[in-house]
C-alpha cells in the first residue's frame, strides 16, 4: 500500500505530535507499506518544497508556509495533487485534526482515497473553543473513513461530537532506551546538583498548558523544607517565555532551576531523568504525554495531574501519584507524601509504572494495533 501521511508537525520540529508522527510513519513502513510524509515548514520560503528520503520506504516532503493560512492550504493541495500523480496513493493518514487533518480529509474526499484521522488531544480541545474552527473539525470527523484517538477519554469526546466510534491507539515508548539506571555523579556535578539536593523534574516543551506555575510553586514550597532543585529537561516554548520569566522572577527560586534546553538525544534525556527524585507533570490538559511514559519506563517516581489520558496510564498510589487538576496548588503536598514513603514503597510505585509501559505501551504493542487499523481500511471504505 502507498500511504500519504499528512502531519501537523514532524522532526526536526520538537514536541509530542512531531515525535509521534515520526514514530507512527516509520511503524507503518515496517508493516510493509511505503509512506510519503507531507508537512508544512516555517523555515522554507512560501511554496518552496524539499523532499528527503528518510528510509527506503519513507519520504519526507516539506513545503514552506505562506503568510496567510488560506493561501498555504491551497498551495498544499496543489502540491499534494502533483505528488498523488507521481505516487498514486491508496490511503491517507491525517496526523492531528486541525490543518493536517483538514488537508488530508479534503484531498481524500476529492481524490476518492480512504482517510484515517488521528486525534492527538490538543487538536480536539483547541478546535472546540473559539478561535478554533468547530465546523471544520466536525466536517473532518464526519467525512473521514476511520478515526484513531490516542486515548479512551479522547475517543469518548469524539463520540460525543459526531456519534462515531474512534479506535484507541495509545502512544508507545522504547523501554530499552528509557530504562532504570544508576545516578551519574559526573552529570549531576555538571548540572550543579549537590549531594544534599532533592531533585524535582519535568521533561518536554514547557508552556502554560503543562502547568508551568505549579512546577515553580512546588519547587518553592518543597525548598522551604529541604534543599531542592527543579530540573527542566527541555526548553520553554517561545511564546511562553514571558510567563516563565514572571513565574521565576524571584532570584532565590530561579537559581534553583536548571533549564537544559532541547536535548535531541533520547539516551541523554533518559540519563537526565535518572538524576531526578520525582518527575512532575501538572498539566492542565493533555493527550497522552510521551514524557510521562518515558519517566515511567525509567523507573522514576511520577506525580501528575488527571488531565487527558494520564489516569489511563497512572493509578494513584499504585504506579504513581495523581493530583486532580482542581488541586494542582497541592503538588508540593504530594511531593512530601512521596518523599515520606518508605524506600520499598517508592520502589514498588516505580516498578508498577514501568510494568504498565512494558505491558501496554511498547512499540510491539503499538505495531500490532496499527496493523489491525490499516488492515480494516478497505472494509471501512466499502461500507
Predicted segments — roles?
Residues 4, 194-210, 216-220, 231-233:
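Conserved donor-binding/catalytic core segment of Leloir-type glycosyltransferases
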Residues 41-44, 173, 203, 229-243, ...:
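Glycosyltransferase donor-sugar binding loop
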Residues 284:
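Aromatic "clamp/platform" in nucleotide-sugar-dependent glycosyltransferases that forms part
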Residues 316-317, 321-328, 337-343:
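Conserved acidic donor-binding segment of nucleotide-sugar-dependent glycosyltransferases
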Amino acid at each position: 500500500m502507498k500511504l500519504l501521511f499528512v502531519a501537523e508537525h514532524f522532526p526536526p520540529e520538537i514536541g509530542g505530535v512531531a515525535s509521534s508522527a515520526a514514530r507512527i510513519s516509520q511503524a507503518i513502513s515496517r508493516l510493509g507499506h511505503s509512506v510519503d510524509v507531507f508537512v508544512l515548514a516555517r523555515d522554507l520560503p512560501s511554496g518552496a518544497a524539499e523532499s528527503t528520503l528518510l528510509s527506503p520506504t519513507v519520504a519526507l516532503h516539506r513545503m514552506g508556509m505562506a503568510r496567510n493560512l488560506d493561501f498555504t492550504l491551497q498551495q498544499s493541495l496543489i502540491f499534494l495533487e502533483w505528488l498523488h500523480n507521481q505516487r498514486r496513493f491508496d490511503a491517507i493518514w491525517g496526523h492531528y485534526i486541525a490543518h493536517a487533518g483538514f488537508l488530508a480529509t479534503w484531498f481524500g474526499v476529492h481524490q476518492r482515497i480512504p482517510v484515517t484521522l488521528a486525534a492527538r488531544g490538543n487538536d480536539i480541545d483547541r478546535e472546540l473553543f473559539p478561535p478554533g474552527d468547530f465546523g471544520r473539525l466536525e466536517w473532518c470527523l464526519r467525512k473521514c473513513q476511520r478515526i484513531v484517538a490516542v486515548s479512551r477519554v479522547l475517543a469518548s469526546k469524539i463520540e460525543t461530537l459526531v456519534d462515531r466510534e474512534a479506535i484507541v491507539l495509545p502512544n508507545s515508548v522504547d523501554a530499552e532506551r528509557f530504562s532504570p539506571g544508576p545516578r551519574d555523579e559526573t552529570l549531576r556535578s555538571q548540572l550543579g546538583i549537590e549531594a544534599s539536593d532533592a531533585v524535582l523534574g519535568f521533561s518536554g516543551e514547557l508552556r502554560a498548558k503543562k502547568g508551568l506555575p505549579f512546577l515553580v510553586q512546588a519547587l518553592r514550597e518543597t525548598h522551604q523544607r529541604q534543599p531542592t532543585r527543579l530540573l527542566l529537561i527541555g526548553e520553554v516554548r517561545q511564546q511562553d517565555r514571558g510567563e516563565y520569566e514572571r513565574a521565576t522572577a524571584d532570584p532565590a527560586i530561579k537559581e534553583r532551576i536548571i533549564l537544559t534546553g532541547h536535548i535531541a538525544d533520547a539516551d541523554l534525556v533518559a540519563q537526565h531523568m535518572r538524576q531526578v527524585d520525582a518527575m512532575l507533570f501538572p498539566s492542565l490538559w493533555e493527550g497522552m504525554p510521551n514524557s510521562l511514559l518515558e519517566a515511567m519506563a525509567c523507573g522514576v517516581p511520577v506525580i501528575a495531574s488527571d488531565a487527558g489520558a494520564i489516569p489511563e496510564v497512572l493509578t494513584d498510589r499504585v504506579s504513581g501519584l495523581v493530583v486532580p487538576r482542581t488541586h494542582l496548588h497541592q503538588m508540593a503536598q504530594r511531593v512530601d507524601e512521596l518523599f515520606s514513603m518508605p524506600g520499598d514503597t517508592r520502589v514498588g510505585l516505580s516498578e508498577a509504572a514501568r510494568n504498565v509501559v512494558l505491558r501496554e505501551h511498547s512499540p510491539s504493542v503499538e505495531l500490532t494495533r496499527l496493523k489491525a487499523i490499516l488492515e480494516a481500511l478497505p472494509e471501512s471504505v466499502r461500507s
